[in-house]
């Protein structure tokens, strides 16, 4: 919003934590969580750097991927395609971070499950971010989404026990965002 030549940035506060609501704010935290180059045989994505996986980006030179290139991929393939700007501001950070971890459809399913646990009118858990989902998530709390995100991580470990080594880091990340 422009007022008398000044731009005002609204910062959303949750408790004593300043909520990040823009791509430029959120991406720095995501890149920090994702870390640098890793080639762990137990990682479903295979070779990764900054969270960009060779499995999903076979034409990208992962080892030599720059931060700026990773940011561009995240902005185009995750933020814009994930419609992050349409999600309520208080949920943008966790939603984008879940898109990185679970893909867009998986992230939306977590939001839909969280909404269904709160709202009387249930929505279909189909992974689509349409009008019904956007309406249903308007007033769900960040803590409710965190709880369903932790559940999703737990189910991954239950289904694939070799992923247990990632559990504690996933759990911490779920609570930090």
PLM features: residue spans?
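Cell-wall polysaccharide-cleaving catalytic domain and substrate-binding groove, primarily
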Residues: 11-177
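Polybasic, lysine-rich low-complexity intrinsically disordered segments
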Residues: 2-3, 7
């Amino acid at each position: 919003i422009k007022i008398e030549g000044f731009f005002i940035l609204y910062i959303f506060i949750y408790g004593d934590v300043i909520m990040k609501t823009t791509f430029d704010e959120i991406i720095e935290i995501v890149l920090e969580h994702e870390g640098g180059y890793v080639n762990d045989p137990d990682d479903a994505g295979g070779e990764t750097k900054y969270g960009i996986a060779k499995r999903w980006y076979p034409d990208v030179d992962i080892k030599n991927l720059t931060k700026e290139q990773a940011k561009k991929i995240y902005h185009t393939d995750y933020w814009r395609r994930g419609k992050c700007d349409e999600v309520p501001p208080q949920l943008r950070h966790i939603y984008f971070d879940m898109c990185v971890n679970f893909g867009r459809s998986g992230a939306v399913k977590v939001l839909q499950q969280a909404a269904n646990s709160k709202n009387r009118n249930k929505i279909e858990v189909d992974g689509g971010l349409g009008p019904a989902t956007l309406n249903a998530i308007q007033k769900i709390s960040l803590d409710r989404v965190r709880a369903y995100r932790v559940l999703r991580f737990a189910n991954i470990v239950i289904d694939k026990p070799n992923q247990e080594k990632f559990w504690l880091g996933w759990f911490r990340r779920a609570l930090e965002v």
